[in-house]
């Protein structure tokens, strides 16, 4: 490809277009990372990009969850090179969706989700043999739900934006899409193993309910830091500081 300063020669300006998903996209963009004020003036542009993405990818269209992928990408590319941020963001979206589409709970990939659920179970049991309870049929739908609730967005829907950026840094540094996907799976395994006692000692329904309540907190407080420890041990994360109220 040549040196980075020549990459702009390979880009082609994107021609925006509309799709049948405009209404849903508009709603989703307005409620994505609502606490992040940086995005507020950019939301119309994000709507336009998702709309264009859906119209170009006719067979895929727009699936809820894509909104969480495009926000962090847009911020990174816009702050890096605003002149080509649209093109770079949509190109990155295309690449991510090629990797993640099968994890979306659309129905056509139900067999793949079950297979991936089996992989998750096996990885968990390898680390903690007592987690063999996850192989019970009662947990099959739960494992599918765990995958489809976090993997399609690479955890962006259950993390604070700054933690999304930290986690994605570790995922994107993998050498290939396969390795990147495997790191995302490892992140899910870390989350499940961290709560192993729920599955080992509690009834199925109770375990699933408690786990669902703790997912966001555990990802924010433990799993992101653990992923950095494993994938980038040279990185040291500063603890978040809180400002005392007057």
Model regions and ranges:
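Helix-rich, well-folded core regions that mediate interactions or catalysis
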Residues: 1-246
């Amino acid at each position: 490809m040549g040196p980075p300063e020549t990459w702009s020669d390979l880009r082609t300006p994107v021609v925006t277009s509309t799709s049948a998903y405009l209404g849903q996209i508009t709603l989703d963009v307005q409620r994505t990372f609502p606490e992040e004020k940086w995005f507020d003036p950019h939301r119309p542009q994000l709507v336009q990009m998702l709309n264009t993405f859906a119209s170009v990818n006719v067979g895929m269209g727009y699936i809820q969850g894509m909104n969480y992928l495009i926000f962090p990408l847009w911020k990174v590319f816009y702050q890096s090179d605003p002149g080509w941020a649209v093109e770079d963001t949509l190109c990155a979206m295309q690449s991510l969706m090629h990797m993640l589409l099968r994890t979306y709970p659309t129905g056509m990939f139900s067999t793949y989700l079950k297979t991936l659920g089996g992989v998750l179970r096996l990885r968990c049991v390898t680390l903690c043999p007592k987690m063999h309870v996850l192989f019970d049929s009662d947990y099959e739908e739960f494992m599918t739900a765990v995958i489809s609730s976090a993997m399609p967005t690479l955890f962006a829907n259950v993390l604070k934006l700054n933690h999304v950026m930290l986690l994605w840094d570790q995922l994107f540094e993998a050498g290939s899409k396969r390795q990147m996907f495997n790191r995302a799976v490892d992140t899910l395994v870390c989350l499940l193993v961290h709560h192993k006692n729920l599955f080992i000692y509690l009834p199925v329904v109770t375990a699933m309910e408690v786990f669902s309540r703790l997912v966001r907190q555990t990802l924010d407080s433990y799993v992101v830091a653990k992923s950095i420890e494993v994938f980038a041990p040279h990185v040291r994360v500063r603890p978040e500081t809180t400002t005392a109220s007057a």
